Amino acid sequence: MDSYQEEEPVASTSGLQDLQTLSELVGPENAGEGDLVIAEEPEENPRRPRRYTKRDVKCVSYHAYKELEDKHPHHIKLQDWIPKPEEMVAQKVQNQDVGTILSFDVTCLKSITSLGRNDPGNDPSIMSHVLPVVTPWPMSQDHYAPTLFGLLDRYYKGYLENPATFQTWKFTCQEDPSGKRYMGTQFWVPPLGQVNIQFYKNYQIVTCCQALDPFANIFHGTEEEMYDIDSGPDVWCTPSLCFKVIYEGAIGQKQEQKSWLCRLGYGHRMGANDYRRVDLYAMKQGKKNPYGDKGDAALQYAYQVKRGCKAGCLASPVLNFKALQFHRTLMADLTNPKIGQGYLAHGYHAAMEAYGPQRGSSEERVWWNATRNQGKKDEYYREGGEEPHYPNTPAPHKKTWEERHKVLKLSPFATPSDIQRWTTRALPYGWKVIDGNGDDYTSRRNIRTLTEMTQEEIRKRWERGYCDPFIDSGSDSDGPLSKPQTVKVW
């Protein structure tokens, strides 16, 4: 198992001595201990093209949510929901070091990934702005503010639907197992799960347990059976879904922050293991079911996505890569949420297809080792061995995953957007799919003739696996002149 002892020692960062300056913009002239300093822009060289400087790439993720606040002056404000610096001073909030924070979950800590574009290493996932973990909307790995604003945005939408059971985040002063004081709160955000936020003077910590869901993942057995992993709910705490992200810096820091992604396993703190069956039923009391009928994106994520990504037998770099593929597919649709936005995507079918097999596959493992994405020493499967019920070895005489999933089959939880996309991709032009409600979806597939195709399109046909770019699929039904047919999906 990956543990924090295997990581390079991290220097302790004591925060600002005077928290009164936390709300000010930190610059080279007034930066305190523990703050990141923005480098000054170098002078322009007229003989060379201008390159991006540190000032250009900094503050990108922080302003992702600031732009939203400026566009909606009467909307919610993040600073109205998080503790004020003066309040943290009054409560005597203390500094903490990252090694001590990691030690709290050492028994359930599956891996630690140091994130940041300036972080040394050969893991490409650390270079992204998106936090490499499967979530309903993308979170930021560069700054805590967009991540919290996305959570607040989604939480506030639930408040508008059912104001009697929602309230402002209540931050209270608490002590961690080492005795250090911090400001913390926790709340449940569907379909994500249970969220816990901690503010130290020099760190912000967000812990998320996606296995905690009293509406979509509750177990109806006995109290003893509930804590048995062999007979528990469908989704238990797994390193592919449960995580803790640690942001380094003061609460008022505007610059890009250093962060660590910790993947948590079964039995982690602030997770589903801390809740008894009676607690889950109590969480449902007085709350409106946040999930709609089949076709609702929230229901699709709570049931299909979590059950399709729960296996934790793969190594952390592989899970990071698959999670980024998941978010990349979602963000390719510009109408889906971006960093700093907390609404749901139109559908997660395409993202699940991009995520691939949750337990891995032979061809994916061969590709991973052949491309050497993580170097020769890094493995495809988790170093700590197999997780329960998630074997590393594929069944013998079984077709490869690619052969069985040329087009990922439709799920009963697919949204209308997913059905339309699947119909256009899987069925000939003019064919229809009719769902249980009587709504029909017509395939828009169109095959262009050779005279209309460019050299770039011909090359792409080669890359997609066509043996000859000048030959169609061999079916007369792949064009506008085909005879439409209807397929019923119930």
From Swiss-Prot:
It comes from the Viruses. It comes from Simian foamy virus (isolate chimpanzee). This is Protein Bet. Residues 11-20 have a biased composition (Polar residues). InterPro entries: Foamy_BEL. One of its GO terms (cellular component) is host cell nucleus. The keyword Kinase does not apply. The keyword Secreted applies. Residues 1-20, 25-52, 471-490 are annotated as: Disordered. Keywords: Host cytoplasm, Host nucleus, Host-virus interaction, Secreted. Bet interacts with host APOBEC3C; this interaction does not induce APOBEC3C degradation, but prevents dimerization and incorporation into virion of the latter. GO terms for biological process: positive regulation of DNA-templated transcription; viral process.
